């Protein structure tokens, strides 16, 4: 069994609380499960995701376990084939988001014309809503795309709380687990696999 891990497990406060109060504690808890599952379950991170996580944790507290239990591997981008429908879906999704972002901007302009004393607040609201319209539910970084490609290459399960990653995993037929239940999954695996030689 193979898992490809996203940063949300260790960094997103809503998800991380299942593993620890801060990113380092969350990683320590995860590594304790990885140690019990060593040789039976593999945990991967693309290099970009690994670097991202390392910005949030105290690496000195986590070595050598983090190097032993998390396999850093980039996807083989020169060999992987992506179905054409993915490109069609992406183009259509981007077009919808641009239109939605335009409507958000138009609404903000109308509000600013009516309420000229409150322009700064309207701009903040515009930025927040524009960002939500364009980025929520889409793969919006190279690191997110690497995560999906690596899971596809390895026939692994993605672990993430990112709606965009999970949406595209579903579209591409990739197995996934929401980060919010990952600790329960690990506990179940430890219970099932303890003492078994797989």
Curated annotation (Swiss-Prot):
**Which EC class is the enzyme in?**
hydrolase
InterPro entries on file: PIN-like_dom_sf, RNA_free_RNase_P
Against HAMAP family, the record matches this protein to:
RNA_free_RNase_P
Q: Which reaction does it catalyse?
A: Endonucleolytic cleavage of RNA, removing 5'-extranucleotides from tRNA precursor
Q: Which UniProt keywords apply?
A: Endonuclease, Hydrolase, Nuclease, tRNA processing
Question: What is the protein name for this chain?
Answer: RNA-free ribonuclease P
- Give EC number(s), comma-separated: 3.1.26.5
Similarity comment text for this entry:
Belongs to the HARP family.
Question: Would the keyword Hydrolase turn up in this protein's UniProt record?
Answer: yes
Q: Name one GO biological process term.
A: tRNA 5'-leader removal
Q: Tell me any Pfam family this protein matches.
A: PIN_5
The keyword Ribonucleoprotein appears for this protein: no
Function statement? RNA-free RNase P that catalyzes the removal of the 5'-leader sequence from pre-tRNA to produce the mature 5'-terminus.
User: What species was this sequence derived from?
Assistant: Thermococcus kodakarensis (strain ATCC BAA-918 / JCM 12380 / KOD1)
Q: Name one GO molecular function term.
A: ribonuclease P activity
């Amino acid at each position: 069994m193979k898992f490809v891990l996203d940063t949300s497990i260790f960094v997103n406060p809503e998800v991380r609380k299942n593993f620890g109060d801060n990113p380092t504690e969350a990683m320590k808890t995860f590594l304790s499960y990885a140690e019990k599952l060593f040789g039976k379950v593999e945990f991967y991170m693309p290099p970009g995701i690994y670097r991202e996580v390392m910005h949030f944790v105290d690496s000195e507290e986590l070595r050598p376990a983090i190097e032993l239990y998390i396999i850093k591997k980039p996807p083989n981008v020169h060999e992987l084939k992506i179905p054409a429908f993915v490109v069609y879906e992406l183009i259509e999704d981007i077009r919808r988001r641009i239109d939605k972002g335009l409507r958000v901007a138009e609404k903000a302009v109308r509000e600013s014309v009516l309420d000229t004393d409150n322009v700064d607040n309207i701009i903040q609201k515009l930025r927040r809503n524009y960002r939500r319209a364009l980025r929520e539910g889409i793969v919006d970084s190279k690191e997110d795309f690497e995560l999906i490609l690596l899971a596809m290459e390895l026939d692994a399960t993605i672990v993430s709380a990112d709606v965009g990653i999970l949406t595209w995993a579903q579209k591409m037929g990739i197995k996934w687990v929401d980060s919010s239940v990952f600790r329960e999954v690990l506990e179940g695996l430890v219970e099932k696999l303890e003492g078994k030689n797989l």
